[in-house]
């Protein structure tokens, strides 16, 4: 397979299913990436959020070829983080599909959710944070995250949002993203993943000074203890930060 972004997009665009429903969270499109055995849970959570969305049937390892892995990752190279971990590239490409689809369709602001999510603070807090995010210059909102140093001198940019630009944070289970970022991210790098998807994203944001915010408290968590992991991440999710007192 020729390693081109449009080629990958055309190959897997049939994995999208457009679902209409009432309501909305204030973005041009919401995406939910789901494995087949989690679609029921994913649809339930998307119904709680409200609004039209695109369900993306996650790319699986059996849908990729040896050439895919060799030309788009370091899966076959000993000593690297992704060595012999065949679930990592499919995850990255599933997110790529959502990014690329947003560009193709001209969406200005999107949100992407994974299929094992929960909303511990309720949907109204999510909507409020998204509304504030759309009115600031920052380009990336992590509604949920992990491995963020909670004591690094962050600053408040709005009632619900904290500026964490330039810091290292991972876990991509709930993102809101502006088109300006997607353009930089896709045009600024080849379709190649030397690390796990969330590590590649975090490094890109830090190196390119992408304005990044998180909410006062995590608004979207992963139900890893209850649902497990289908991506080899079997450790329980670490605690997130509470920035209400900043």
Q: Where are the predicted features?
A:
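An acidic/histidine-cluster motif and surrounding catalytic segment
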Residues: 2-113, 117-246
